[in-house]
Amino acid sequence: MLRLDTRFLPGFPEALSRHGPLLEEARRRLLAKRGEPGSMLGWMDLPEDTETLREVRRYREANPWVEDFVLIGIGGSALGPKALEAAFNESGVRFHYLDHVEPEPILRLLRTLDPRKTLVNAVSKSGSTAETLAGLAVFLKWLKAHLGEDWRRHLVVTTDPKEGPLRAFAEREGLKAFAIPKEVGGRFSALSPVGLLPLAFAGADLDALLMGARKANETALAPLEESLPLKTALLLHLHRHLPVHVFMVYSERLSHLPSWFVQLHDESLGKVDRQGQRVGTTAVPALGPKDQHAQVQLFREGPLDKLLALVIPEAPLEDVEIPEVEGLEAASYLFGKTLFQLLKAEAEATYEALAEAGQRVYALFLPEVSPYAVGWLMQHLMWQTAFLGELWEVNAFDQPGVELGKVLTRKRLAG
C-alpha cells in the first residue's frame, strides 16, 4: 500500500483532527461539481474506462510490426506517458518523444528511424498545440516521402473526441484517432489514451496500473483518517507559507515522474485566487540518490523555505548483491549488501538528515515500483492537487497564465 510517513512533523495527527471540517468541506465542494459540464473532473473516472482499454489493446494487437514509437506532444501530452513508459517498458519497442521543437535532435532522429517500422502518435487535447502541429507536419512529410500512400498506417492521433484541427485532420484522412474525454485536461490525462496507448506498445500491465488508480480513488473518498490525498493536501496547505515544494523520488525507473508532478502542481495551483491574490508554491523536481550529490547541499544548509516530499520504494522487484573486491577494502561496508539496501539506506538517511537540518519533510513509501503502486501514486497526486485547488480557492483545471505567450508567439511568426 501507499504509506504516508510524518515522523518528523510532530503534531500532524492533531492538525488533521483540528482541520477536519475544512478538509471535509473542500472534498464536498469538489465532488459537488462532478458530472457538471466544464468541471474537468473526468480524470476521476478514467480507471473504470474498460472500453478504452479494450480499444487500445485491439490497436496494439493489430500493429505488431512497430519497433519505434514516436510520440509528438508537449506538456501533459508527453510527461505522463514518458514517466510511465520509462518505468515499465517490457516490450523492446523504442520510444522517442518530440516534446520540443529544436531542429537538430529532430533531424538526428529522422536520420536514424526506419519509417517502415515506425509508428507516429500525435497527441494534443485541443488539437491546436503549435509544437505538436509543427512536429506532425515534419513527420508527415517524412512518412509520405518514404511510404507513399501507406503513410496512414504509420500515424495515429490522440485528441478531443469531436473538435479541433487534429480531429478534423484525422477524419479527413481516415486516420485512427483515440479520444481524450472532454472533461479530462492534459495534465490529468496520463491514464487516458494519452498514456494507455504508448504503454500498450511498451508491454506494460495496464490492468494493474488502473487497479492502483482505483485504489487511489477509494482512499480519496474514504473517511478523513483513512483519506491519504486529504492528508497530503493538508500537509501542503499547512506549509503554504513555504514557497518551495521539493518532490524527490528514489527510483531511477521513475526518473521522469518529478517532471510530471511539477506540471501537475505548478500549472494547477499557481493562480490568482477568488480574492484576487496570487497563490501557489513552486514544485522542484529531484531524484535520489543523484541529487544527494547536487541539490541536497542546498536542501540541508540553504534557506528553510521548503516542504520536501520523498517518494521511497520499500522493496525491489529484483536485486543484486554487491560482491567483495580485493583491493577495495575501503568499500567493505558494502560487500555482501545489495544495491537496494544501499538505495534504501541512502533514502532513509537523507530523510533524517533533512529533518535534522530543520527542513519540513515527509515521505510517501511505495511497496515497490510496480504498475499498481505507481498507478495509485499518480492518481493520488491528482486527487491531492484537486483538493488543494479547493483549499486555496483556485480553479485547478485551467491555465489562463499561458495564453498570452501563445498569442505573442503567433504574432511574432505572423510578423
UniProtKB/Swiss-Prot annotation:
Top-level taxon in the UniProt lineage: Bacteria
Keyword Glycoprotein: no
Principal subcellular localization: cytoplasm
HAMAP family hit by this protein: G6P_isomerase
Protein's recorded name: Glucose-6-phosphate isomerase
Known role: Catalyzes the reversible isomerization of glucose-6-phosphate to fructose-6-phosphate.
Assigned protein family: Belongs to the GPI family.
Entry EC no(s): 5.3.1.9
Gene: pgi
Gene3D superfamilies: Glucose-6-phosphate isomerase like protein, domain 1
Pathway stated in the Swiss-Prot or TrEMBL entry: Carbohydrate biosynthesis; gluconeogenesis; Carbohydrate degradation; glycolysis; D-glyceraldehyde 3-phosphate and glycerone phosphate from D-glucose: step 2/4
Location(s), subcellular: Cytoplasm
Keyword Cytoplasm carried by entry: yes
Keyword list, A-Z: Cytoplasm, Gluconeogenesis, Glycolysis, Isomerase
GO annotations of cellular component type: cytosol
Gene Ontology MF terms: carbohydrate derivative binding; glucose-6-phosphate isomerase activity; monosaccharide binding
Native organism taxonomy: Bacteria, Thermotogati, Deinococcota, Deinococci, Thermales
A Gene Ontology BP annotation from the UniProt entry: glycolytic process
Active site positions, chain numbering: 267 (proton donor), 293, 406
Reactions catalysed according to its record: alpha-D-glucose 6-phosphate = beta-D-fructose 6-phosphate
